[in-house]
Curated annotation (Swiss-Prot):
Molecular-function annotations in GO: triose-phosphate isomerase activity
Name of the protein in question: Triosephosphate isomerase
UniProt pathway: Carbohydrate biosynthesis; gluconeogenesis; Carbohydrate degradation; glycolysis; D-glyceraldehyde 3-phosphate from glycerone phosphate: step 1/1
Top EC class for this record: isomerase
This protein's UniProt keywords: Cytoplasm, Gluconeogenesis, Glycolysis, Isomerase
Record's catalysed reaction(s): D-glyceraldehyde 3-phosphate = dihydroxyacetone phosphate
Annotated Gene3D superfamilies: Aldolase class I
Protein's job: Involved in the gluconeogenesis. Catalyzes stereospecifically the conversion of dihydroxyacetone phosphate (DHAP) to D-glyceraldehyde-3-phosphate (G3P).
Gene name for this UniProt entry: tpiA
NCBIfam families from the UniProt entry: tim
Catalytic-site annotation from UniProt: H118, E187
Biological process according to GO: gluconeogenesis; glyceraldehyde-3-phosphate biosynthetic process; glycerol catabolic process; glycolytic process
Entry keyword Cytoplasm: yes
Length: 265
């Protein structure tokens, strides 16, 4: 369990797994990244909703879309089972932060989920564990559910540093974060957008290790990394995996529909 004052090094932080209280929800989220105009987003949704007619009710379906699509999709999603998500959020409610979007702005648009700490944000835009933590706490303070992304690079995996790196991310990212309103996505960075998928059993092993570091073992933990219609059934057959964070395969209604309608093996 992440204890008080977990701001120091990993060996200063004590972890203990809590007791599970029940069945974890399945959260299937699409991350459109920097794709789709408003017109394209509406056209996608019109077709995608038809894919959900027989989707089991215990599956949470989320679309994390560009800021420019939030308003139009908020109106279009009203009354449907699809939840609206954003791809980032600032930690301040307002201020001189050119180009940023605040939690109240997202809430006003009906956003329910927000991705925080995606590897592309960390790699290309200088996100750190400190700023990730600020964003997590700000999002939760306004009732948003964060999807926290953690994962290792190819070099870290080759060096045997996968566990230490992810544990350090968790120790720093989750300071004062409410684990009852949280989703975590394990994204092996070397598998994102590369077509290389982490073996399902290995993803299950790492996600189990992530869960062992949480004081709430019922936090849903997703897998993200080249998820597609062909591998979703095998991924979701793993007992520790509670959903997926899907990139490219979420851009087409049929492929994302197949993913949310995965068939348990």
């Amino acid at each position: 369990m992440i204890r008080d004052n977990p701001c120091g090094t990993l060996d200063q932080v004590k972890f203990r797994r809590g007791k599970s209280r029940g069945v974890r929800p399945k959260v299937l989220a699409g991350n459109w990244k920097m794709h789709k105009t408003q017109q394209e987003a509406v056209a996608f949704l019109q077709e995608f909703l038809g894919e959900l007619v027989d989707t089991p009710s215990d599956r949470e379906v989320v679309l994390c879309v560009p800021y420019t699509c939030l308003s139009v999709l908020s109106k279009s999603l009203h009354g449907t089972r699809v939840k609206l998500g954003a791809q980032n959020v600032h930690w301040a409610d307002q201020g001189a932060f050119t180009g940023e979007i605040s939690p109240p702005m997202l809430v006003e648009l009906g956003v329910r989920y927000v991705i925080i700490g995606h590897s592309e944000r960390r790699q290309y835009f200088g996100e750190t564990d400190a700023t990730v933590n600020q964003r997590l706490r700000a999002a939760q303070s306004h009732g948003l559910t964060p999807i926290l992304c953690v994962g290792e690079t190819k070099a870290q995996r080759a060096a045997g540093e996968t566990e230490n790196h992810i544990f350090q991310q968790l120790a720093l990212d989750l300071v004062d974060v409410d684990q009852t309103n949280l989703v975590i996505a394990y994204e092996p960075i070397w598998a994102i957008g590369t077509g290389d998928t982490c073996e399902e059993t290995e993803a299950n092993r790492v996600i189990g290790l992530i869960r062992s570091q949480l004081h709430n073992p019922d936090v849903p933990i997703q897998y993200g990394g080249s998820v597609n219609a062909n591998n979703i059934d095998a991924i979701m057959a793993q007992p520790e995996i509670d959903g997926v964070l899907v990139g490219g395969a979420s851009l087409q209604p049929q492929s994302f529909g197949r993913i949310v309608n995965y068939k348990p093996l």
